[in-house]
Design a protein with these regions (language model features):
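N-terminal secretory signal peptides and thylakoid transit peptides that target proteins
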Residues: 2-24
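N-terminal [4Fe-4S]-dependent radical SAM core
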Residues: 7-9, 45-72, 78-134, 149-152, ...
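A broadly conserved sequence feature marking short terminus-proximal activation segments
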Residues: 17-65, 88-110, 291-355
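Short cysteine-rich clusters marking metal-coordination/redox-active sites
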Residues: 73, 142, 354, 379-382
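Conserved Radical SAM active-site core
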Residues: 95-230, 397-402
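Conserved AdoMet/S-adenosylmethionine-binding subsite of the radical SAM
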Residues: 162-322, 327
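Short linker/helix segments within small regulatory modules
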Residues: 367-374
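Short metal-binding segments enriched for Cys and/or His
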Residues: 384-396
Length: 402
């Protein structure tokens, strides 16, 4: 097989993941390969069903008819106006004769059984697994995307497997996963499949979490949350300039999504990938943290994760641990109760501590839970209620409050 560390210079991400499996664990790899193993990168190991030939067409939701057989997509803030036989910005929704279609209904290009901590979700069924899936496509373009091989390509350019919602739910149940995670690329762009699969999964006692950039309109978000049991939002930065220059998007729609999630009452965690010199200034982190406390409350977990050079941002170094520690302290000082330093295995900032007495409650080693002292959602030392989803019954009992 050769030396994975030296071969990494020319290898694809998928090959690196295969080396990790062949070696038995990420710990058997060199530093560069371990860096990839610490991120929520895509693979195909768990996909059932046949290889897809062509496109997986299905009627799209959330669009309006316009004159001359044009359509207007109302799923995400881009509100693309699409001419006949053209596609929206995401590349996976197409106008056919004045009827809008999704091209990726069940066209899964990634499928893995992951620790829920890999999403990362730290206050949602810790120590359990999530059947994690994705299709090709995205509705923004982050120049630092770790899954760019699937998110920045059209579906016909990516090898996919056709998996119906029923097949997905059966595969998840067969692996004893309590949760399906819609992740890796951007689940908003495969909304119809996620919606239907999550509804079916809930009927079978399986939860669903969306790992998203938050670029979605209010009406589809509210409808989707009737089926979901949790959400993680990748909060790129607290800067309109950053969103415009580095993600081809805008900050305001993401803030609106976060406020809507707060109104709905669904369990939500936030992740900020800290990129040196781009979104790591103390002033920005302080402003972001204050906004979180004022608009979402102090109990929303906030993860600051380590950047590794990838895609179009290879000229910057990986994030210094000291920067993550500084960001974490700024957020704690601003009143966020649960703040994490991510992608730094064995760092104490990856553990969960009681906000009231500072007792260590969950100790993590990488994506594994080494110790969980939370009992019935409470701190065993002082009895403080710890915000989160601590049982499958609690997850499935969620219903939107607004």
């Amino acid at each position: 097989m050769g030396n994975p560390e030296s071969m990494l210079l020319t290898a694809s991400r998928r090959e690196v993941l295969r080396w990790g499996l062949a070696c038995g664990a990420a710990g058997a790899l060199g530093p560069a390969a371990r860096a990839l193993a610490q991120q929520d990168v895509a693979g195909r190991d768990a996909l059932p069903g046949p290889k897809l030939e062509g496109l997986a067409r299905h009627p799209a939701m959330f669009w309006e008819k316009l004159p001359d057989r044009k359509v207007k997509c109302t799923l995400c803030p881009r509100e693309c106006e699409v001419a006949d036989v053209e596609r929206g910005y995401c590349g996976v929704r197409e106008n056919q004769g004045g009827e809008y279609q999704t091209l990726v209904y069940g066209a899964l290009c990634s499928g893995n059984v992951d620790p829920i901590e890999k999403k990362p979700l730290f206050h949602y069924l810790p120590g359990t697994t999530a059947f994690s899936i994705a299709t090709a496509g995205c509705n923004i373009e982050c120049k630092f995307c770790q899954n760019w091989e699937i998110s920045q390509f059209r579906p016909e350019q990516v090898e996919s497997t056709l998996v119906t919602p029923a097949q997905l739910v059966r595969a998840c149940a067969g692996r004893a996963c309590p949760t399906i995670a819609y992740t890796y690329s951007e689940p908003v762009i495969f909304y119809e499949y996620m919606h239907d699969a999550a509804a079916l999964a809930r009927q079978q006692g399986i939860g669903s979490v969306m790992i998203s950039n938050g670029y979605i309109q209010e009406q589809p978000l509210r409808q989707l949350c009737r089926q979901l049991t949790g959400v993680k939002i990748d909060f790129k930065a607290f800067s309109e300039t950053f969103y415009a220059q580095w993600c081809s998007g805008h900050l305001k729609p993401v803030l609106a999504t976060l406020e809507t999630l707060k109104e709905i009452g669904i369990w939500t965690e936030l992740v900020v990938l800290i990129i040196p010199t781009l979104n790591d200034s103390p002033q920005e982190i302080k402003a972001m943290s204050k906004w979180v406390v004022e608009h979402l409350g102090p109990d929303v977990p906030l993860h600051f994760t380590r950047f590794h050079p990838t895609y179009r941002v290879t000229n910057l170094p990986r994030t210094p641990v000291e920067t993550l520690e500084r960001c974490r302290q700024i957020a704690l000082d601003a009143g966020v109760r649960y703040v994490y330093a991510g992608n730094v295995p064995t760092h104490p900032g990856e553990n969960t501590y009681c906000h009231a007495c500072r007792q260590e409650l969950i100790r993590r080693v990488g994506f594994q839970v080494a110790d969980n002292r939370i009992r019935d959602g409470k701190c065993p030392r002082c009895g403080a209620a710890i915000p989160g989803i601590w049982s499958q019954e609690q997850a499935l009992a969620f219903r939107p409050r607004a």
